[in-house]
Amino acid sequence: KNYAVNVKDVSKMVEGSYEGNEKYVFLTFDDGPSPLTEQVLDILKNENVKGTFFMLGSRLDSGQAPKESLKRAIEEGNAIANHSYSHNFKKLYPGNITDVNYFMDEFRKTNDIMRDVLGVEFDTNVLRMPGGYNSRVYYKDRNLEELDNNLESNKIVSIDWNALNGDAEGKPYTLNEMIDYVKRTSRGKNQVVLLMHDTFGKEKTVKILPEIIKYYKEEGYEFKTISDANV
């Protein structure tokens, strides 16, 4: 069974310009791998659904366990994408303006680490910018055009999200509030790209994940992954 949807189509889904009315949900996890990634993978396997992991190069570099999580995620049919190396806003966006050369270096560095783990044939051009691409638009980042040109010439597609569980919103939510947040932000959308985090301290995300999956199953969504535009 093919779970993958081309990132260019997913990009349209997030922007609301996609023409189709298929009910798709993309479970996306940022900032891993961490010890919680294994628990997330257990749940996905148990529920027989797939997800997309936007991984940090610095986390992959931090030891053998994160590399094993990366391998396992791929072996079990999930998708892997690039979330920068450092996630360090001061380096990526000094003065809240993208340092394009530095940003691109981090993207390449992270892909290289993934390749070291998964083999030379691995490549991804799927990116999620730390903070999201739309935050750059919101802050009127004056280097956005230069960044866009760089992404385009490297065939890299940046993907944000259109639903979230609130696990990175600054204020702590109860489990029920997080589940409600997912339902509220997903309502009325045929294609949902759900933002979650599988990094340290996100135990609540793991706890509610089976419930979230159940919700989308009951609502008739198919679970999909975000695939490379070059595939």
What are these regions (language model features)?
Residues D61, A65, H87-L195, T199-K217, ...:
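Catalytic domains of cell-wall/extracellular-matrix polysaccharide-remodeling enzymes
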Residues K1-R128, V231:
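Active-site beta->alpha N-cap acidic-glycine motif
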